[in-house]
UniProtKB/Swiss-Prot annotation:
Domain of life, source organism: Bacteria
Keyword Magnesium: no
GO cellular component assignments: large ribosomal subunit
Descriptive protein name: Large ribosomal subunit protein uL2
Biased composition (Basic and acidic residues): 263-276
Gene3D superfamilies: 2.30.30.30, Nucleic acid-binding proteins (2.40.50.140), Ribosomal protein L2, domain 3 (4.10.950.10)
PROSITE patterns on file: RIBOSOMAL_L2
Recorded name of the encoding gene: rplB
């Protein structure tokens, strides 16, 4: 996979770049694994706007992804590697020997025709899923469960990978891409390898219309608004905030104020992501 820089034929294409996905299969998604996706476009169930910088974007079909990997000891063949508009990673369509079809996140190095499986007997290679207790220390993993049987919740974005650092009793030490070190139960499932499509973050959108197509609206700074619209607004020229601290459009403190609530799972964090 490579990044193609567009020729500056127009102002919109001057800095634009695209991913050249030669390895992707240009096929329609598996119909039995797709459902209609109703876009919320930044509104709540009353229709009130809750996020100012989102819009509907292009219509999408949601691909049902197997995050649980609970079909154990049944080999499957990779039929296709496909694009998924709902996530940064690509997805792989698996054909199991018993006839069932499932989508999984496509890890780096997985190719069409490869054989993958899940379970304690699976070998350590990209695409295979095992319990953390059955994996060797030092292996790269993704799609990690936090609760047994709930399905993978961590490390699912393109190009990300966690690392199994150590095993201690029934728990395993996992180092996440952010640098956080976390205890996860050894019975939780994870998939071997790094998530593919690692160059996804290097793409330059290039123009506003392409961002709108993705469902993104303009994000306007408060300093360029009028005083009636934002606490930072008003003044002649480029004025400072004019307050003791930056504020949100609704007058609450912003930038530097901690907003994360304490969770019962905090006790499993061995090292915070901002600690060395």
């Amino acid at each position: 996979m490579a990044i193609r820089k567009m020729k500056p034929i127009t102002n919109g294409t001057r800095h634009m770049s695209r991913l050249v996905n030669d390895e992707l299969d240009k096929v329609r998604p598996e119909k039995s694994l797709t459902v209609p996706l109703k876009s919320a476009y930044g509104r709540d169930n009353y229709g009130h706007r809750t996020c100012r910088d989102r819009q509907k974007g292009h219509k999408r079909l949601y691909r049902i992804i197997d995050f649980k990997r609970n079909k154990l000891d049944v080999p499957a063949r990779v039929a296709t590697i496909e694009y998924d508009p709902n996530r940064s990673a690509n997805i792989a369509l698996l054909f199991y020997v018993d006839g069932e079809k499932r989508y999984i996140l496509a890890p780096k190095g997985l190719k069409k025709g490869d054989i993958v499986s899940a379970g304690s007997k699976a070998e350590i290679k990209p695409g295979n899923a095992l319990k953390l207790k059955d994996m060797p220390v030092g292996v790269q993993i993704h799609n990690i469960e936090l609760q047994r049987g709930k399905g993978g919740q961590l490390v699912r974005s393109a190009g990300t990978a966690a690392r199994l650092v150590a095993k201690e009793g029934t728990y395993c030490h996992v180092e996440l891409p952010s640098g956080e070190l976390r205890l996860i139960h050894g019975e939780c499932m994870a998939t071997v390898g790094e998530v593919g499509n690692s160059e996804h973050n290097l793409v330059n959108i290039g123009k506003a219309g392409r961002a709108r197509h993705m469902g993104k609206r303009p994000h306007v700074r408060g300093a360029v608004m009028n005083p009636v619209d934002h606490p930072h607004g008003g003044g002649e020229g480029k004025n400072s905030v004019g307050r003791k601290s930056p504020l949100t459009p609704w007058g609450k403190p912003a930038l530097g104020i901690k907003t994360r609530g304490r969770k019962t799972s905090d006790k499993f964090i061995v090292r915070r992501r901002n600690e060395k």
